[in-house]
Structure formats: structure tokens, C-alpha cells
Amino acid sequence: MSEAAAALRFTPALSRQLLSLTLAIATVGLQALMVAPLLTDMARDLAVGPAAIGRAVGLYGAGVAVAALIAAPRLDAWPRRRALALALAALGLALAGCALAADAVMLAVAMAACGLAAGVILPATYALAGDLAPQELRSRAVGRVIVGWSVAMVLGVPAAALLAEQLGWRGAYAVIAGVAGLAALAVLRLPAARQPEGARLVPYRVALAQPGVVRLLVMTLAYMMAFYGCYTFLTDHLRATDDLGPSLGGWISLSYGLGFGVAVLGDGLLDRWGPWRVAAPAFLVLAGLMLLLPLAAAESPWAVVVLALPWGVVNHFGLNVLVSLLSSGEPALRGAVMGLYSAVTYIAHFLAGAGLGLVYAGAGFTAVAVIAAAGLAVAATMAMLPAVRRV
């Protein structure tokens, strides 16, 4: 990439538009990630074990995957702003259902409904970010939008943990339902975006035929299973060995989110070096960090809080690599590809919650961390394969 391209800057209007998209991602990130610090209290209140809440989390992931698979061929023909606002409003209603759940079955149904809404929100948001930004700024634009995950962790998840201590986990869910409603209103204030030229109903085979897409989706599956498997059960593992409240999960999320957010300062390197060159090193470093998690947990919960900072930094680059590469293809197919990305992400979420939940219940957190590291090693190996890697 040329120095002139690297020197391009965001206009104030584009920055404001990306901020609204960041809020949408932050809302989804908050409701998806807040389960971790609340899991122990939710299980106790509903008289079930942690694995049952893990299965409910898995149904959330299944809901995202189903919605994204249904929406993926249509996202390039739908008015994205309207679809995004409606999905955020639906998310708010589903979160209210979580707050009112009388048992684990009702909670699982409400979480599945949250997933259906998120399955539209995520690909629509990523596709809009790709539409708004010029090619030379795309990695930086995507980096800004995915900072919503950092906002969710740095501010949202710790706040949810504190709310749970004051209002209970149900009160925390009720407050986040209101946040989803506010996010819907913010999206409605965006100017109507023009659909990419040639936007149409896109069959899956057309989206999957783009060079590199199938490989990247398999890498995404391994990558996301590693993250969600470790993150979902880490706090419960720590609380089982130390008598600490849900605020511990908030501290872990705060440290992770700070690392994830600070890493945005390095997103320009992805534009200059190219995402493929960053992929394998990032995945291998993450694999090493996964193996360190159970060792840190055995030492002290606060050792995990410290380790979460570099985890967040490296995970930012790994996620940006995947989203940037998948969103860099033909504009008229971008919505379909990002829909498939969201579907695969939350198939991984489902497998991590349901499948690795059984591993956690039977063999403990160390086994989960080893499986996560192995998945990341697979993703790194695929990134280094010599076949055509361009999307």
C-alpha cells in the first residue's frame, strides 16, 4: 500500500456514521458477553448447573447462526439501516424476556430469540462499514466498528456485573434491554445508505465461490470456538476455586476490553502489511495465551486479570484480520459473505457453549483451554497454506 493511501483520514461525517455502527456492535457484544460474570448467579437462581446455562448460551449462538443463514442471501437487497434498527428493537424485547425467565427453559428460548436478532445485526453492521469506507481505509474502518466489542467489555460487562450485584442478574438484563432500544433509535438517525450497485438476492454458492471465502470461514469456526469456549467458562472456573462475586468477571472483561481497544492504534499496520501476513502470527500467539490461562488461574484470579490484557490486544488483530478479509470482496456480495461469517461465528458459539460445556463439566477448564489452543493452531496452519489467499 502506498504512503499516500496510508495517510488517508476519516471525514467527520464518516466518523459519526461509524460511531453509530460501533454502538450497534457494542450492544450485541454486551448482551452476548455479560453471561460470563453472571453465569454462577443465573445457575443458582434457576436451580441448574453451569452446563445448563452453557446450553442456553449455545442456543443463543444457534439463533444467530440460523438468522444469519436466512438473512445472508438477502442482506444485499434489504434496506440495511431499516433492517438493523428493527433487529435492535427485537433484541431489546428478547432481553426483556431473559429478565423475566422463570426457569432455564424460558431463559434458553429468550436467548435463542436474542440470537435471531443478533444474526441480522452483526452482518448488516459489518456490511455497512464496508460500504461506507473506501478500500484504503477498510481495515481501519472495521477496526473502529469492532471496537464496539471493547466498549462492551471495558464499560458494559463490568457495569452489568455491578448491576447484578445491586439489582440481581434479572435487573442487569432489564437495563441492557433499554440499551438495545436506544441503539435502535441511534441507527434510525443514520442517513439512508445507497445499496451497492448490483445488489440482489445472492445464492450461497455465489458468495462461497469468491476466492478465499471458504478457507476464511473454516478459520473463523476454529477461532471463535477457541474464544467463546475459554471466555464463557473462565469466570465460573475461577469462582469455583475462590469465593468471589460476579465482579471478578467484570475485572477480567475490563482488562481484556482495554487491550482490545488499545489495539485499534495498530490497525493501520494491517492496511500497510496486509491482513494475511498478520493472521498466522496472531493466531499462534493466541494459542499460547489459551494454554497460559489455566496456569494463571491456578496461581491467582488476578493473574488471569493481568493475562486478559494481552489476550484482548492480540484478539483484536485476529478478529480484524478475519472481518477485513471477508468484507474486502465484491461490494454487491458483501452482505451475503458477512452473513455467512456471522452464521459460522455463532455455530462456533453454539459448539463452544454446548459441546465445550460438556467438556468443562466432565474434564475441567484445562481441557477446554487445550482444545481452544489446538483450534487456533489449525487456523494458523490454514492461514499459511500456499493456495490462493485473496478474497
Predicted regions and their residues:
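A late C-terminal transmembrane helix in Major Facilitator Superfamily
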Residues: P331-F365, A372
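Helix-loop-helix hairpin linking two adjacent transmembrane segments in secondary transporters
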Residues: Q135-L137, G143-R189
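C-terminal transmembrane helical hairpin of 12-TM major facilitator-type secondary transporters
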Residues: R277-L322
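Paired small-residue
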Residues: A94, V105-C114, W302-P310
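Helix-to-loop junctions at the C-terminal end of transmembrane segments
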Residues: A67-P79, A263-P275, Y360
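Conserved MFS/SLC helix-loop-helix module at the cytosolic interface between two early adjacent transmembrane helices
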Residues: V66-A102
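Helix-breaking motifs and short loop linkers at transmembrane-helix boundaries and internal kinks
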Residues: A47, P79, L100-M106, A296-A298
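Cytoplasmic helix-loop-helix junction between adjacent transmembrane helices
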Residues: M111-G148
